Amino acid sequence: MQINKAALEIFDFTSSLAVYSEHELKIGEQDIHDYIAGHVTKAFKDPGARTGTLHAHSPMGKRIGEYKSGEISFITLAKELGEKTFDYMKQATVGVVIDTIVCDVVTDTNYICMLLCQAHDAFTHQLFSEDDGSLSTELVPHKAVLPMPTQKLRAFIAINTLDLSVRIFEPKGEYDGEVCYILADKVLQLGTDQSSRDTVKKVKTIIDKVAQAHESDGVAELTMAKSMIAKNAEVSDTVNPIRIVEEVFKSNPIQQEAAKKELAEQDMMRPLPVNREFATKVGEHHKIKTDTGIEISFPVEYMQNREFIEIKTNDDGTLRIELKNINKIVNK
């Protein structure tokens, strides 16, 4: 990843004060470059990110075009994006300091990214020399420490400067009494698809709901769905919920139609974007919990192989779980 340019802006919502830099960050310094690159890399993989596309004639779409053509500078673009963000957020955000990094990034293509880093309190050590020449150490508080790249950003925007496609994650906020996504709905004026996490969660919920409504525990259906999602991620960055429910309920047309009705109500009757790394992890394990408090986690593919695990119904209607071919048990 290459960071071409970056600018830092300070949003202090404790005092409703914003500071916009008139100079770029010194990204030639390796530590600064690596800090920004680390956050951007992690944010691109976030399964909570939603996707959409800016209209070329929208206010932000036009400014991105003007930046590409050299009509406006990077600092001008960063400041305008920052000012618009602060103006909308100040009504919905209180009591925090957010340092915002706007950067020009190249990965597979060129992006304008905005990283909202919520500051937090932290402590470090400091060495003091006493009057008698002895040394002492103290804990020193810092009131505005930024999150490390291993920690999640408060919000993130990545705008592809070629096709104006957008990846974005943010918490919901309230503006003029309306609960909304401030960055997507107000700053960018952008409609988005649901996130990978929401897509997978809704597919699983629908399959489980339909299965249990037709006197099944849903375990076999859910493990099949998770396996399909994971295998699909090997070749595609979209998932088709219709194909999944058709395959899971292929022997039961009534359940199939019930699941499709649920998908239609959730506006999921079409292929939806999905983070391939996240989708692959979804298919690794399945976890079940009994009404007696026992929890079991097992590889998804084991449900297709009765040599390892099998769920049976007893004569009295209760269930039993058989774990087979075990050579060793390890306490954890």
Annotate each predicted stretch with a short phrase:
Residues 2-282:
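Long, hydrophobic alpha/beta structural blocks
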Residues 246-332:
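C-terminal structured domains
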